[in-house]
From Swiss-Prot:
The keyword Transit peptide applies. It comes from Pyrus pyrifolia (Chinese pear). Keywords: Calvin cycle, Carbon dioxide fixation, Chloroplast, Photorespiration, Photosynthesis, Plastid, Transit peptide. Heterohexadecamer of 8 large and 8 small subunits. This is Ribulose bisphosphate carboxylase small subunit, chloroplastic. HAMAP family: RuBisCO_S_bact (MF_00859).
Length: 183
């Protein structure tokens, strides 16, 4: 702000004696792209029924029912996955070079907060690992075989399949593969 206090005559003599400082050579600020008249514009309706692709038979979209159904994890809104669907999911994580692993929970497979009180994705549950992660697994049938063994050993447990990226050292996918009767 000192530059605004000096007189204009002083500025003229300073600029005549030496080159102008970098501040005097500032470029005008960026004002954005060219006017929008050069670009074609389409106006879209905000009507949600225009998004539906079922011939307009839908007036509104149904959400998860709040009563009687517990929220589990990824894919929990779908009906129980068949062996073929599970094999496709496992094939996907194998194609991504993730390491499959099975975990089980004997009491509650749904989301709740016990050991962790802050909001967010992680809810503080601890699942028990079924054997070791399946490093070197190349076929989804190997994972499904382990899933069947886990079901026989713990028929009243929730069993999930996770995909672990051992390069980034993060869990990339997790979904419930088996729920006990009554869930």
């Amino acid at each position: 702000m000192a530059s605004s206090m000096i007189s204009s005559g002083t500025v003229a003599t300073v600029s005549a004696d030496r080159p102008a400082p970098a501040q005097a050579r500032m470029v005008a600020p960026f004002n954005g792209l060219k006017s929008s008249s050069a670009f074609p514009v389409t106006r879209k309706s905000n009507d949600i029924t225009s998004i539906a692709s079922n011939g307009g038979r839908v007036q509104c979209m149904q959400v998860w029912p709040p009563l009687g159904l517990k929220k589990f994890e990824t894919l929990s809104y779908l009906p129980p996955l068949s062996s073929e669907s599970l094999a496709k999911e496992v094939d996907y994580l194998l194609r991504k070079n993730w390491v499959p692993c099975l975990e089980f929970e004997l009491e509650t497979g749904f989301v709740y907060r016990e050991n962790h009180r802050s909001p967010g994705y992680y809810d503080g549950r601890y699942w028990t690992m079924w054997k070791l992660p399946m490093f070197g697994c190349t076929d989804s049938s190997q994972v499904l075989k382990e899933l069947e063994e886990a079901k026989k050993a713990y028929p009243q447990s929730f069993i999930r399949i996770i995909g672990f990226d051992n390069v980034r050292q993060v869990q990339c996918i997790s979904f419930i593969a088996y729920k006990p009767a009554g869930f």
